[in-house]
Amino acid sequence: MFFVLESNSNNVLFRIQRIYIKDISFEAPNTPGVFQINWNPKIKVDLNSDAKNIHIDMYEVVLCVTVTAKIEDDTAFLCQVKQAGIFNVSGLNKTQMIRCLKVHCPTILFPYASECVSNQVSRGTFPQLNLDPINFDILFIQSLQKKYNDTLKI
């Protein structure tokens, strides 16, 4: 699959080589008791991503999605999915490459991770859970702002 990324160069390449689950975990520590409680959980979603160069112009990007559902102080379930992809990327300057690996690649991986979370929650016999779409562009900008603010505190 090819994508066109914003660049002044005609030599930009972006290809998805593979998308796969790197790690998956589902825990429901308070079953079966949690099934007897009125289902009105507090859902917390944590996201992070990491990218590493694995070969010339080839990167592995791993998106980690952790979902915790709590009813009062009891954990109903905890689901963690590490959705990974191998991307062939070239022709970008350093700034464009960072944005590609921190925004574009996680955006591609998120629907796969979300579906995996939903499947695991359903297999745990909990009500359907559909994660809201994530704007990785905003998360990236916020992380840059935080790094900038942290450097000002020194």
From Swiss-Prot:
The UniProt keyword set, sorted, is: Chaperone, Cytoplasm, Protein transport, Translocation, Transport
Sorted alphabetically, the Gene Ontology cellular component annotations on this record are:
cytoplasm
Q: List, alphabetically, the SUPFAM superfamilies matched.
A: SecB-like
Q: Does the keyword Chaperone apply?
A: yes
InterPro entries assigned: SecB, SecB-like_sf
What domain of life? Bacteria
What Pfam families does the record tag this protein with? SecB
Q: Which GO biological process categories is it annotated with?
A: protein folding; protein tetramerization; protein transport
Single Gene Ontology MF annotation: unfolded protein binding
- Localisation per UniProt entry: Cytoplasm
User: Which Gene3D superfamilies does the record cross-reference, listed alphabetically?
Assistant: SecB-like (3.10.420.10)
Q: Which HAMAP family match?
A: SecB
Name the family: Belongs to the SecB family.
Function of the molecule: One of the proteins required for the normal export of preproteins out of the cell cytoplasm. It is a molecular chaperone that binds to a subset of precursor proteins, maintaining them in a translocation-competent state. It also specifically binds to its receptor SecA.
Q: How does it assemble?
A: Homotetramer, a dimer of dimers. One homotetramer interacts with 1 SecA dimer.
Q: Which PANTHER family match?
A: PROTEIN-EXPORT PROTEIN SECB, PTHR36918
| Protein known as | Protein-export protein SecB
Identify the species of origin. Blochmanniella pennsylvanica (strain BPEN)
Supply the gene name: secB
